[in-house]
């Protein structure tokens, strides 16, 4: 388990450093499976049902994580789960259309630090591991989500 978390952390660190250093490369270096099937990542996550289950687990972890739980104490968690499911569905190449606020607006008043953001990513990785999502699919999803950090980290 520790090795898996360490590997995931290393992969995320690489993904995030790519986002910081070469954002264009991170966005143009499409995963191999996406070239043949734009919905391959969506399918790897179990489509809408799998993403819904993943977001249920993930949001529950966020709410229970003492490092960041205070950021969610006044949040409608069911609404958050729905919004995140729609967003990840769209990001993964699924048929959903995320219609929530953009990331800058959604996080403007939250005071999210880099440490808060890293805790959130760790919770997402743990939820993906618990659902046995293949490591390569996890990395692809994290690579697609990584550019959002610029709008989420506000302090």
Residue ranges and their predicted role:
Residues 9-19:
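Bacterial N-terminal signal peptides
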Residues 1-4:
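Positively charged n-region of N-terminal signal peptides that target proteins for export
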Residues 25-155:
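Core of compact, soluble alpha-helical bundle domains
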Residues 21-23:
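Signal peptide cleavage region of secreted peptide precursors
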């Amino acid at each position: 388990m520790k090795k898996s978390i360490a590997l995931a952390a290393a992969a995320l660190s690489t993904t995030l450093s790519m986002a910081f250093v070469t954002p264009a490369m991170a966005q143009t270096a499409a995963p191999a499976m996406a070239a043949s099937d734009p919905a391959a990542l969506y399918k790897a996550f179990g489509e809408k049902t799998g993403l819904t289950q993943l977001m249920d687990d993930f949001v529950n972890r966020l709410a229970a994580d003492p490092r960041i739980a205070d950021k969610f104490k006044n949040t409608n968690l069911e609404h958050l789960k729905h919004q995140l499911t729609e967003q990840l569905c769209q990001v993964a190449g699924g048929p959903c259309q995320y219609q929530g606020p953009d990331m800058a607006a959604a996080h403007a008043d939250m005071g999210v630090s880099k440490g808060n953001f890293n805790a959130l990513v760790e919770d997402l990785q743990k939820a993906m591991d618990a659902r046995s999502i293949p490591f390569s699919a996890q990395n692809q999803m994290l690579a697609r989500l990584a550019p959002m950090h610029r709008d989420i980290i506000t302090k």
